[in-house]
């Protein structure tokens, strides 16, 4: 699997999603503000051939990463060869301490 590259626009959208989750007190792939992650990406002008999203709530990046890698579905997104770009968002203030959003796209 090739390393993922950071995408600036995807980083902005992932950060917005994390902030939206804290502000509106939810933990879901579907935002009451923006809809699905795929709808949200399109609203912000991000085009893709394939896309995915991981969410984690944890006190540290290390613990969040470990929990994502120990989850089959989340691990598949991280290691998915069709994804070549990532955006990561982090927001503080949730019941978990921090919310982590990983958005993946393949172009």
Spans of model-derived segments:
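Intrinsically disordered, low-complexity
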Residues: 1-12, 95-96, 107
């Amino acid at each position: 699997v090739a390393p993922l590259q950071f995408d600036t626009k995807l980083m902005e959208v992932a950060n917005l999603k994390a902030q939206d989750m804290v502000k509106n007190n939810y933990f879901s792939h579907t935002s009451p503000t923006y809809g699905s992650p795929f709808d949200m990406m399109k609203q912000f002008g991000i085009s893709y051939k394939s896309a995915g999203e991981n969410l984690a709530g944890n006190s540290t990046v290390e613990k969040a990463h470990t929990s994502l890698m120990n989850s089959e579905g989340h691990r598949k997104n991280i290691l998915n060869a069709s994804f070549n770009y990532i955006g990561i968002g982090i927001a503080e203030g949730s019941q978990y301490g921090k919310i982590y959003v990983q958005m993946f796209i393949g172009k």
